């Protein structure tokens, strides 16, 4: 675990080099992005880098504020560069995200950015998406019918449970998350669209065709994919 954390940090530190003075930065959510936000904040405090951050979760918002990064929103600014982690990345830079249950706002921010950079360790690089269960955010009233629909499509589906309280995980948007294990996903773009057409689905964790760069920390050093 410590090795992977070091590889995550390696990728995160490299991503900060892509940030220019004056940028509005999309701040992803998760353990790898945590390192990115901390280092970005250090450069703000110690080197005078001037940036603003658009957080994708309360977790990222609080960390940005603690790190000295000015927080803004999509209502006020366009995003120059978004930096986010991923649970899986295929050779075409399609992603599965949502392990942190923040994928809806992550997708909004990441897809609206002029440039979207993904930071991962080497364990997240896969030939084909699907080993990681696909997160699907649903409004609570639609939980059961959406679960049945996903199962009819061949998925094994679980309602994600919370570790901090009894009952299901509740997203920052007040919704539930279904983790749908489909196995190998042959056409990520088609699957992304199909899932989002199910009534009651808010967003799913496939990010097809929006990443511009992947920075991966590996045991042999940094690997850059474009």
Swiss-Prot record:
Superkingdom of origin: Archaea
Leader sequence segment: none
One matching Pfam family: Rib_5-P_isom_A
Entry coiled-coil feature ranges: none
Protein keywords: Isomerase
Entry keyword annotation includes Isomerase: yes
Record-level GO BP terms: D-ribose metabolic process; pentose-phosphate shunt, non-oxidative branch
Full protein name: Ribose-5-phosphate isomerase A
Molecular functions per Gene Ontology: ribose-5-phosphate isomerase activity
Function recorded in the entry: Catalyzes the reversible conversion of ribose-5-phosphate to ribulose 5-phosphate.
Gene name of this polypeptide: rpiA
């Amino acid at each position: 675990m410590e090795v992977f954390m070091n590889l995550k940090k390696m990728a995160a530190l490299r991503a900060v080099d892509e940030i220019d003075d004056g940028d509005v930065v999309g701040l992803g959510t998760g353990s790898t992005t945590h390192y990115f936000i901390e280092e970005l904040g250090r450069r703000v405090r110690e080197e005078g880098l001037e940036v603003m951050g658009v957080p994708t979760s309360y977790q990222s918002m609080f960390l940005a504020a603690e790190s000295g990064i000015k927080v803004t929103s999509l209502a006020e600014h366009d995003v120059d560069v978004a930096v986010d982690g991923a649970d899986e990345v295929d050779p075409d830079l399609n992603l599965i995200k949502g392990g942190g249950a923040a994928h809806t706002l992550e997708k909004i921010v990441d897809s609206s950015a002029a440039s979207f950079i993904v930071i991962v360790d080497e364990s997240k690089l896969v030939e084909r998406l699907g080993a990681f269960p696909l997160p699907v955010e649903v409004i609570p009233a639609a939980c059961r019918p959406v679960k049945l629909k996903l199962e009819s499509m061949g998925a094994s589906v679980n309602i994600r449970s919370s570790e901090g309280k009894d009952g299901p995980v509740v997203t920052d948007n007040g919704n539930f998350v279904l983790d749908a294990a489909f196995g190998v996903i042959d056409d990520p773009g088609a699957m992304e669209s199909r899932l989002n057409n199910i009534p009651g689905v808010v967003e799913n964790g496939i990010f097809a065709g929006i990443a511009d760069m992947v920075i991966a920390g590996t045991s042999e050093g940094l690997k850059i994919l474009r």
